[in-house]
Swiss-Prot record:
Protein name, per record: Cellular tumor antigen p53
Motif Nuclear export signal boundaries: 319-330
Biased composition (Basic and acidic residues): 255-264
Cofactor binding: number and manner: Binds 1 zinc ion per subunit.
Binding locations of Zn(2+): 154, 157, 213, 217
Subcellular localization, as worded in the UniProt entry: Cytoplasm; Nucleus
Organism: Platichthys flesus
Intervals of motif Bipartite nuclear localization signal: 275-295
Cofactor(s) needed for function: Zn(2+)
Residues under site feature: Interaction with DNA: 98
Major place of residence: cytoplasm
Stretch list, region Interaction with DNA: 248-255
GO biological process, one term: apoptotic process
């Protein structure tokens, strides 16, 4: 049965091929040359009507966000620049008591603060800055021989801290939007916080600075003077204003401020101070003279045998006491020499009943 059906299919195959040929011949297809022209016309209409010519152009705000901030200079500028927005800083007034944790000297333009203690700084502007403006704080060394070095925390304080920015000296407290940066070219570290307009009833905006290392820390500042540069910048890094002030991180800000202010006011009378310091050790001289006098009052034999030791604090006092001792010794030597000369000049005493006749004098018998 299967074979019969297969044979029947083979018998009708030629007929089916004839039918397909007739069908293919009946299909109307354009030539290849006309297809290319029609496609070009259709594509041109599509690009002209529905294609956005600005598809690959980014909006200006996206270009600003993706742009790279130009590298900062090796030697930072430390001069004040209020700019068109009248950028100013104000510090809270505080005295020189030992209990204060932060105090600012208007005379020296210098901030004294304790380690890791917040120091409020008020920012005052004459008009509203551009949208997205930020405040940046950077620490640099004051003296020219150290200005190229990067200000960092000492290794001891870094190991005690677990924060990601533990190497940064300056921190901005009280804001979750503070960002810490390190310049890839100069390796200088800075911290930024968005500028916030003053609250109702106030004309200033306050930020909280804290310094995480003492000025005397070995391996860190190592007693080198530092400056804090506070700048008002656009999101692109363009500086709109700049203010600089010196900072000393110490254990007793009030005491150090008072000492520095007193020394600065006495600077013109510096030579007089040195004279007073040189004369001060003379107060201890009477004690040494009493010792020397007690020695001179004793017999000559005891003076030669006994040795006294006087403990002196300070090189200047030692030199003064040494000169006094040398003067006494010189006087003693002169006294001894004078006594020897006097003994030699003494005339021999004649025996009893006789009188010594001087040269050129006649005796009674003559």
């Amino acid at each position: 049965m299967m074979d019969e059906q297969g044979l029947d299919g083979m018998q009708i195959l030629p007929g089916s091929q004839d039918s397909f040929s007739e069908l293919w011949a009946s299909v109307q297809t354009p030539s290849i040359a006309t297809i290319a022209e029609e496609f070009d016309d259709h594509l041109g209409n599509l690009l002209q009507n529905g294609f956005d010519m600005n598809l690959f152009e980014l909006p200006p705000e996206m270009v600003a966000k993706d742009s790279v901030t130009p590298p900062s200079s090796t030697v930072p500028v430390v001069t004040d620049y209020p700019g068109e927005y009248g950028f100013q800083l104000r510090f809270q007034k505080s005295g020189t008591a030992k209990s204060v944790t932060s105090t600012f000297s208007e005379l020296l333009k210098k901030l004294y603060c304790q380690l890791a203690k917040t120091s409020p700084v008020e920012v005052l502007l004459s008009k509203e800055p551009p949208q997205g403006a930020v405040l940046r704080a950077t620490a640099v060394y004051k003296k020219t021989e150290h200005v190229a070095d990067v200000v960092r925390r000492c290794p001891h304080h870094q190991t005690e801290d677990t924060a990601e920015h533990r190497s940064h000296l300056i921190r901005l407290e009280g804001s979750q939007r503070a960002l810490y940066f390190e310049d890839p070219h100069t390796k200088r570290q800075s911290v930024t916080v968005p500028y916030e307009p003053p609250q109702l009833g106030s004309e200033t905006t306050a930020i909280l600075l804290s310094f995480m290392c003492n000025s005397s820390c070995m391996g860190g500042m190592n007693r080198r003077q530092i400056l804090t540069i506070l700048t008002l910048e656009t999101p692109d890094g363009l500086v709109l204003g700049r203010r600089c002030f010196e900072v000393r991180v110490c254990a007793c800000p009030g005491r150090d401020r008072k000492t520095d202010e007193e020394s600065s006011t006495k600077t013109p009378n510096g030579p007089k101070q040195t004279k007073k310091r040189k004369q001060a050790p003379s107060n201890s001289a009477p004690h040494t003279t009493t010792v020397m006098k007690s020695k001179s009052s004793s017999s000559a034999e005891e003076e030669d045998k006994e040795v006294f030791t006087v403990l002196v604090k300070g090189r200047e006092r030692y030199e003064i006491i040494k000169k006094i001792n040398e003067a006494f010794e010189g006087a003693a030597e002169k006294e001894k020499a004078k006594n020897k000369v006097a003994v030699k000049q003494e005339l021999p005493v004649p025996s009893s009943g006789k009188r010594l006749v001087q040269r050129g004098e006649r005796s009674d018998s003559d």
